[in-house]
């Protein structure tokens, strides 16, 4: 097993979330409106997001960032690629539907950049410290020499594990049921990841506005689970 294959567990481990934070991303609002009542409703919400939610766009941008890093490393069109990198990063960050979501992205990205710096991979391409989670994730995977397909799969896995960690405290659903949900999500994550690999950004379909509305209906998305 290669070193890069092992390094990916630094990113996806639910026991070591980046920066020690977990975000509920609107679950409290769903719970208040009685849309989340049990493990099945949590599972349906996560599946819906994986299949038609904005998380797909975040995942697709990973590939663009990864390709840009490769071109920059090869000294190809440095100015143009740096401009494209910053433009895409600002675009995906501004696409978030609430201030809390943007702050979440910035915090998680900063923590991941701090981690990669400790591993000897300091990010030097932007002066603006307000970067997106997708950019930081792609940078980490590029530095750790993780393949693009694994990068996308791990991204979806980590996101779904984060949602389940939040659901454990908010609903709660119980740790055993959360593990069963995570198991059932594996096939969907694999399918969706391959779809993302084969599509351009303009070809992605998004039709799930429920979570975006839920995120706007409550003020504090930050759930402090690992700072005890």
Curated annotation (Swiss-Prot):
Positions of disulphide bridges: none
Pfam family of the protein (one): UreF
Gene3D superfamilies the record matches: Urease accessory protein UreF
GO CC list: cytoplasm
Keywords: Chaperone, Cytoplasm, Nickel insertion
GO molecular function ontology, one term from the record: nickel cation binding
InterPro entries noted in UniProt: UreF (IPR002639), UreF_sf (IPR038277)
Main location per the UniProt record: cytoplasm
Annotated localization: Cytoplasm
Similarity-based family: Belongs to the UreF family.
HAMAP family reported for this sequence: UreF
Subunit structure and binding partners: UreD, UreF and UreG form a complex that acts as a GTP-hydrolysis-dependent molecular chaperone, activating the urease apoprotein by helping to assemble the nickel containing metallocenter of UreC. The UreE protein probably delivers the nickel.
Role this protein plays: Required for maturation of urease via the functional incorporation of the urease nickel metallocenter.
Descriptive protein name: Urease accessory protein UreF
């Amino acid at each position: 097993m290669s070193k890069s294959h092992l390094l990916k567990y630094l990113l996806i481990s639910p026991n070591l979330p980046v920066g020690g934070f977990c975000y509920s991303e609107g679950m409290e609002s769903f719970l208040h409106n009685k849309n989340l009542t049990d493990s099945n409703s949590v599972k349906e919400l996560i599946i819906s997001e994986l299949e038609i939610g904005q998380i797909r766009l975040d995942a697709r941008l990973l590939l663009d960032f990864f390709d840009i890093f490769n071109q920059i490393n090869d000294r190809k069109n440095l100015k143009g690629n740096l401009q494209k990198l910053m433009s895409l990063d600002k675009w995906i960050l501004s696409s978030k539907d609430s201030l809390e979501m943007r702050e979440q992205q910035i915090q998680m990205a900063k923590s991941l950049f701090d981690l990669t710096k400790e591993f000897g991979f300091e990010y030097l391409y932007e002066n603006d410290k307000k970067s997106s989670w997708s950019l930081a994730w792609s940078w980490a995977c590029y530095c750790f020499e993780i393949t693009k397909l694994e990068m996308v799969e791990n991204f979806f896995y980590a996101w779904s594990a984060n949602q389940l960690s939040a659901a454990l405290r908010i609903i709660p659903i119980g740790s055993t049921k959360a593990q069963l949900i995570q198991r059932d999500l594996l096939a969907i994550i694999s399918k969706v990841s391959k779809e993302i690999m084969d599509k351009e950004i303009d070809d992605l379909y998004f039709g799930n506005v429920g979570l975006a509305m839920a995120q706007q209906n409550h003020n504090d998305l930050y759930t402090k689970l690992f700072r005890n």
